[in-house]
Amino acid sequence: MHHLNIAFIIPSLKANGPCIVCRDLVVQMIAHGHHCIVYYFDECGNLVFPCETVRITMKTMIDFEQFDIVHSHEVRPNLYVLLHKPLKCHTKFVVTIHNYVWRDYRSTYGVLKGGVGTLIFLLSILRHDKKVCLSKDMMAYYSHILNSKRLAYVYNTRNVDFKLGVTKEDEQSILGFKKDNYLIGTFCRILKRKNLCLVFRALSLLPHYRFLVIGDGPDLELVKMQCRECQVEDRVLFLGARKEAYRYLPLMDIFAIPSQSEGFPLALLEAAAFGTKCVCSDIDIFKECFNDNEIVTFPLAHPEQLACKIVEAQSREELKTNIKEKFNDSYSPQAFYDDYIAIYSDLLKE
């Protein structure tokens, strides 16, 4: 197909999940010869895009007619499209939905604020021509409230740089903490729904394991308190936030994701790309994307079973090869590009 002009709209240049997904897509589009520009609202973060980036406000007028595709991520960019999309326009508008809105908003903000936030989100994507979910499960979730003909799904990818290493200081700190034990690791934005307390409870049953937590977030102090309550604080290392946290995967024996809810965890894809053994909660998104030969899953709220599954994963060397092969076959940057360009192409034929 001919080369496209594509505008992406994101909240900021912060290195959070939706903006990283957008960056990964821009990288692939440019690599395949398409022209991209990224519009953003907030002057914060230092995510680098391989194209022009332009700061805007809700009052800024973008000439949408110059683009084939306008692709937004998150509520404010979606609202911008809702307000500024012309009544008649050849340009096609795409939104990527990054979460299970009511489930996640209710967990984060409570019933009242979560309900209002859900209504605002659903309103914000009203005028988009195609709404892209992150999985089949998410598409089924939204098919009850949105026009299923306007829904699609594309699995995320990750562009990882295997040459990046960690600082000598961090490496020495982690190895000194690990000693002769096995190291469980995770990296994430630290929220209550990430369910890290379950690993703390399992750790009390695993004397030869240590737990490395990389990241920051609004619930960090709560999570540290849970760690102390489980009396395992001497076996948990809170390293803090680190850029490109996947650099630390080679130091981990097992990567753990005990989340209660996930859209499509980029961290799991990074672990898969590195061929790291993964132990995950048995939520639908994980079971859809990886099978029992690629990851080990455990039921939520059962620390005893989590402890058993960690020991099982440690003994299964084939998990490393299997999960890496699955990433290369199904979640590679090329597969990500192919799926999105197919959606763009179909829209432009309408």
Say what each PLM segment does.
Residues 241, 260:
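Aromatic "clamp/platform" in nucleotide-sugar-dependent glycosyltransferases that forms part
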Residues 126-165:
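Donor nucleotide-sugar binding/catalytic pocket of nucleotide-sugar-dependent glycosyltransferases
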Residues 163-178, 320:
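A short helix/loop element that forms part of the nucleotide-sugar donor recognition site in Leloir-type
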Residues 72-78, 97-100:
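Short His-centered aromatic/hydrophobic patch
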Residues 17, 315-348:
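A charged, aromatic-enriched C-terminal amphipathic alpha-helix characteristic of glycosyltransferases
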Residues 19-27, 182-205, 218-224:
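A conserved mid-protein helix/loop that constitutes part of the nucleotide-sugar donor-binding site
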Residues 292-303, 312-317:
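Conserved acidic donor-binding segment of nucleotide-sugar-dependent glycosyltransferases
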Residues 277-280, 287:
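Short hydrophobic beta-strand element within catalytic cores of glycosyltransferases
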